[in-house]
């Protein structure tokens, strides 16, 4: 699907405005500018996304999140600038979304269950992609892109504007902006450095058939067929000893290896230095875990 898009849905709102939108139909738009129209009597809403500009309103923010989770667009293909300024912080409850600041006014005797205080809802409350498994639905935000065959285990987390090509095994954290190539595995507790906070400005990606060991992490991109040893965090500034041939090595910044395929990153257990060398074998997923999602 390409822009311009006309989206139809039903919104949840209070006296201050729109809280959430549940979209159900997407068509080509004939409008010339971004706009939305809401029927006050039925809460039905029509949104026109013509230009992929910075987000200015809640309905457009929700539409862009939907478009990723429905696999119409991949991470980093839409502009999400301003989304944190536009979306309110909400309590996601068994009675639907409500403003977090209003919780103190509620009757404490009410049977109210609060699942989260966040600007983004769990994806599975609004979109169920075909062919995925999510062990804990609260750990995948709306706006995540999960390719068919993806398995998210209990400790896995996927932010908005991030995701997987599928099939993939995810037991670690996929930060905003990060995209994981097919047949790659993120081990338990591993981390991918995003661009929402801190000093990292580069968008991180992981290629195909990669393995990030348990409690490892990356601040650089990986090409295809790479492995990060368990417990090793490779940031852009990490000094890496590249073993080129037997007896030949070169010390370089990890950033200069970003995107390189076929490397094994590990820490020398005798010297403590971080090393990289060409891999002798390739990694494969257990297909049985992903074919019947």
List where the protein language model places each region.
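Inter-domain interface/hinge segments
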Residues: 120-122, 126, 131, 161
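C-terminal amphipathic alpha-helical segment
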Residues: 194-263, 267, 271-275
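Short, low-complexity, polar/charged sequence segments that are solvent-exposed and flexible
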Residues: 189-190, 247-249, 283-287
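A structural motif detector for beta-strand N-caps
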Residues: 132, 138-140, 144-146, 150-152, ...
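A generic secondary-structure signal marking the coil-to-beta-strand transition
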Residues: 17, 130, 136, 148, ...
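Terminal amphipathic alpha-helical/low-complexity segments used for targeting or macromolecular assembly
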Residues: 1-125, 256-293
């Amino acid at each position: 699907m390409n822009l311009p898009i006309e989206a139809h849905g039903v919104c949840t709102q209070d006296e201050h405005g729109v809280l959430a939108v549940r979209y159900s139909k997407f068509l080509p738009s004939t409008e010339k500018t971004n706009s939305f129209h809401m029927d006050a009597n039925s809460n039905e809403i029509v949104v026109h996304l013509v230009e992929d500009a910075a987000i200015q309103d809640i309905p457009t923010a929700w539409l862009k999140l939907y478009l990723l989770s429905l696999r119409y667009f991949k991470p980093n293909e839409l502009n999400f600038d301003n989304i944190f300024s536009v979306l309110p912080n909400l309590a996601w409850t068994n009675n639907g979304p409500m403003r977090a600041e209003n919780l103190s006014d509620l009757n404490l005797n009410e049977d109210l269950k609060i699942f989260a205080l966040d600007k983004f809802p769990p994806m599975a409350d609004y979109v169920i992609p075909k062919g995925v498994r999510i062990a804990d639905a609260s750990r995948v935000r709306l706006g995540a892109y999960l390719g068919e065959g993806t398995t998210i285990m209990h400790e896995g987390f996927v932010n908005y504007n991030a995701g997987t090509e599928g099939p993939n095994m995810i037991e670690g954290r996929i930060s905003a902006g990060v995209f994981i190539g097919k047949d790659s595995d993120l081990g338990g507790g591993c981390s991918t450095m995003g661009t929402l906070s801190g000093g990292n400005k580069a968008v991180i990606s992981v290629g195909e058939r990669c393995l990030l060991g348990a409690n490892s992490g990356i601040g650089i991109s990986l090409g295809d067929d790479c492995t990060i040893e368990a417990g090793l965090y490779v940031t852009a500034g990490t000094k890496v000893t590249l073993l080129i041939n037997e007896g030949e090595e070169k010390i370089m910044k990890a950033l200069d290896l970003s995107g390189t395929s076929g490397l094994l990153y590990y820490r020398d257990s005798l010297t403590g230095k971080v090393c990289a060398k060409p891999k002798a074998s390739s990694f494969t997923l257990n297909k049985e875990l992903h074919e019947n999602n």
